[in-house]
């Protein structure tokens, strides 16, 4: 896609029902790497809005994407209103186009959408303290609980088979068989690690197929920076970045948060001796999450959360190693073995989780372990 200039941005802004002429800042806003995000505001007001160009190379069906987001946010707003909350602040609000649509296609074929800007909030890029991690957990759990009665099967898959771990395993096997760059001979321990966990990769989907755990509306990208906190109080306000909201398992969202938050190292740490899964942070997050989501979950689903932590971490490592075998085409790299370092970090975390897995189960399901 072409770079977004001020004229392109202003032309897109003019398509939305902002209530008047807009001032547009063509500098990117935030930390996101997929969509192009900008802040715009009305010329005579200080009220701000988010204007985004959707990356249609990643999200090929913007109509389905926005149908998901509109349906989920309308449901959330009704729940928040009924609970006495502030839906204008506690949920993303989609701004329609002047014709009443949820998104706009410009003359270049680019898809755009707009939201109210949620003022006086911050998002964390890393876990600063236990209290913040618990707050993020409570906010994500509340999001899950409020969507517990939403018909998940009506949602579009915005990225097909995104958390289908057996499919990720199959893609790895194809990359290994092709061995396009001849790298397989240098990573025998990592290959053996994945092969030894083929059976594990099926655990969650087997539980879903057997009817032991339910299909849910899931966020599928539950990094801590996708939760807005009140700038003054630190209270959890709103879950953002809803592009990957689609049918899934609660274990996916729980597990991805643990993968990214319950350790004290960078995702691409080259020194594996510095990689440490923090069981205490896992417990902090689990208790926060279950305090708001637990009421709508069965014992079997609670137990699946521990598996979610293991499998989302394993799956991510498989994806990194697959990309390494294929020539580093998907994930951006800053050094030759970057994806290999990423994969090794994930596998170290998996190994450490396996060592304390009984304790992980006990934490999420103390009454039925």
Kindly give the residue locations of the regions a language model identified.
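Juxta-kinase regulatory segment immediately upstream of eukaryotic protein kinase catalytic domains
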Residues: 1-26
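Conserved ATP-binding subdomain of kinase catalytic cores across diverse folds
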Residues: 25-174, 248-250, 261-262, 266-273, ...
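ATP-dependent phospho-/nucleotidyl transfer catalytic cores
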Residues: 27-31, 52-53, 59-63, 118-134, ...
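Conserved active-site aspartate in kinases
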Residues: 241
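Active-site activation/catalytic loop segments of kinase-like enzymes and analogous catalytic loops
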Residues: 251-294, 311-330
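Small/polar glycine-rich anion-binding or flexible loop at a beta-alpha turn
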Residues: 302-312
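Long, compositionally biased intrinsically disordered regions
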Residues: 353-356
């Amino acid at each position: 896609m072409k770079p977004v200039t001020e004229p392109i941005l202003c032309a897109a802004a003019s398509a939305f029902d902002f209530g008047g002429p807009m001032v547009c800042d063509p500098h990117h806003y935030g930390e996101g790497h997929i969509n192009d995000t900008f802040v715009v505001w009305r010329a005579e007001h200080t009220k701000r809005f988010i204007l985004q160009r959707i990356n249609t190379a990643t999200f090929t069906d913007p109509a389905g994407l926005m149908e998901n987001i509109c349906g989920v946010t309308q449901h959330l707003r009704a729940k928040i209103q009924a609970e006495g909350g502030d839906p204008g602040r506690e949920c993303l609000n989609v701004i329609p186009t002047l014709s009443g649509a949820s998104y706009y296609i410009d003359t270049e074929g680019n898809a755009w959408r707009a939201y109210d800007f949620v003022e006086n909030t911050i998002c964390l890029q890393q876990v600063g303290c236990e209290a913040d991690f618990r707050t993020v957990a409570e906010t994500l759990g509340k999001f899950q609980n409020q969507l517990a009665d939403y018909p998940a099967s009506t949602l579009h898959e915005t990225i097909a088979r995104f958390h289908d771990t057996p499919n990720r395993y199959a893609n790895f096997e194809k990359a290994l068989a092709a061995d396009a760059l001849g790298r397989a001979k240098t990573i025998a321990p990592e290959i053996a690690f994945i092969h030894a966990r083929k059976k594990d990769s099926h655990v969650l989907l087997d539980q879903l197929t057997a009817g032991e755990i339910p299909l849910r509306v899931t966020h599928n990208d539950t990094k801590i920076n996708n939760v807005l906190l009140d700038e003054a109080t630190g209270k959890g306000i709103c879950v953002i970045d809803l592009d990957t909201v689609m049918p899934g398992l609660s274990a996916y969202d729980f597990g991805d948060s643990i993968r990214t938050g319950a350790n004290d190292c960078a995702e691409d740490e080259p020194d594996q001796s510095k990689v440490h899964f923090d069981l205490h942070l896992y417990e902090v997050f689990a208790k926060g999450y279950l305090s708001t989501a637990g009421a709508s979950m069965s014992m079997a689903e609670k137990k699946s959360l521990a598996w979610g932590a293991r499998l989302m971490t394993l799956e991510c490592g498989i994806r990194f190693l697959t990309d390494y075998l294929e020539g580093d085409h998907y994930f951006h790299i800053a050094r030759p073995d970057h994806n290999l370092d990423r994969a090794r970090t994930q596998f170290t975390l998996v190994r450490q989780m396996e060592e304390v897995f009984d304790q992980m189960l006990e934490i999420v399901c103390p009454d039925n372990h």
